[in-house]
Amino acid sequence: MLESCTLCPRSCKVNRLAGAAGYCTQDATVRLARAALHHWEEPPISGDTGSGTVFFSGCSLHCVYCQNQDISNGSIGREVSIERLAQIFLEQQGRDAHNINLVTPSHFAPQIVEALSRARAQGLKLPVVCNCSGYESLEALRIFDGHVDIYLTDFKYAFPERAERYSRASDYPQVASAALDEMYRQVGEYREDPQTGLLEKGVVVRHLLLPGGLSDSFAVMRLLAAKPYARKICVSLMSQYTPMPGCEQAFPELAEGIDPQDYDALIDYALDLGLDNSFCQEGEAASESFIPAFDYEGV
């Protein structure tokens, strides 16, 4: 599979087993930037003690406004074996993580599934979260089938021209829509533990409002509301957009934060469409530190 890689929708077909790096910037060796408890996910995922986040190096999307550019562009990452990855999962469980949270994992899907199988054999019992961009191939998602309990996925754009401008992926809307269907097929209806309030199964769809992007965000909400399972997933509306250094020259429209009135309008619009199983962020979210230090903690 990795000899002519088609794990992501870019389908670059490089031989990652021979050491070639794909569009994702990675060859076949798993590389991590951090493995530690994280408290900034949605409440049913972070809970009280935190989510056991494992940050994988590389990404198939490369959004111009990415807050994790140091790892998405492959400049940060430490090589780990499959056996070490399995041990990292078990170590997160030992730290009382509520779940194993795989951040941008799809380009390492076969290796991750092997590590999860080894960890399960050694006592891993936590639910597994696939925390991804939404730009996912059905091939990669089907590798995760039966191994992932929760999909925490972005749905970034409904307008192809915006997807092309900011992520060089004009096919993002249709790819993400098909991926969402597959995610729901695998894990089904959103379900929290009635005793703890922690998420056990289901899909959480994140959408980040971008500056000047309200009409696109409205279109994303319409697309989600039209899904036959719309009331059986959760939507997380995010206001934490932060301008990244250097972005303002090529993309001046992204140089400022979002308009709070736009965010309020987005919340109202989603609720009017019946997307009432949803999360929203407080006004100070963009000033808070959602970006951990990629310092190889836990790796």
Where in this protein do the model-derived segments appear?
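Conserved Radical SAM active-site core
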Residues: C24-G146, I150, F159-E161
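Auxiliary Fe-S-binding modules of radical SAM enzymes
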Residues: M1-A21, E189-V299
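Conserved radical SAM core fold
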Residues: S72, A109, G134-S137, F155-P173, ...
